[in-house]
Amino acid sequence: QNINWDLRTASVFCATWDADKPLSWRSKYGWTAFCGPVGPTGQDSCGKCLLVTNTGTGAKVTVRIVDQCSNGGLDLDVNVFNQIDTNGQGNAQGHLIVNYDFVDCGD
C-alpha cells in the first residue's frame, strides 16, 4: 500500500502479467507470495486469491497472489500479517501457522 499498489515498484514476479490491471483490482486485497505445497505455481498462480486462516485464533483474510517464494508456504504482506495476528503471537515468533484455501476473487 505504501507504494500505491504498484506491482513493478514492488518487483514482484506477477508484475509481468498483472501490473497494468486497474488500481481497483490491485488494491482489492492484500498481497502474498505463494509457494505452498498444493496449488498452481508460477504464472498460473498470479492473481489467484486465498482465504488465509490463522490456526491459533481463527482470524481470516483474503489475499491475492502477486509473487513467488521459496519457504514452502506464504509470504504475507506485513499489513495482511498484522490483520490476522490478532493475539500478537505471530509477531513474537516471527511467523504464523495458517491454513489456506483457494477462493474466487470476485473480479
Swiss-Prot record:
Cysteine disulfide links: C14-C46, C35-C69, C49-C105
One example GO MF annotation: RNA nuclease activity
Reported induction: Up-regulated in both the abscission zone and surrounding tissues following treatment with propylene and after wounding due to embryoctomy.
Domain (Barwin) ranges: 1-107
GO biological process, one term: defense response to bacterium
Membrane-crossing segments per the record: none
SUPFAM superfamilies for the chain: Barwin-like endoglucanases
Keyword entries, A-Z: Cell wall, Disulfide bond, Pathogenesis-related protein, Plant defense, Secreted
GO cellular component: extracellular region
Xref: Pfam families: Barwin
Compartments it resides in: Secreted, Cell wall
Tissue-wise expression: Preferentially expressed in the tissue surrounding the abscission zone of fruitlets.
Main location: secreted
Function comment: May be involved in protecting plant tissues from pathogen infection.
Name the record gives this protein: Pathogenesis-related protein PR-4
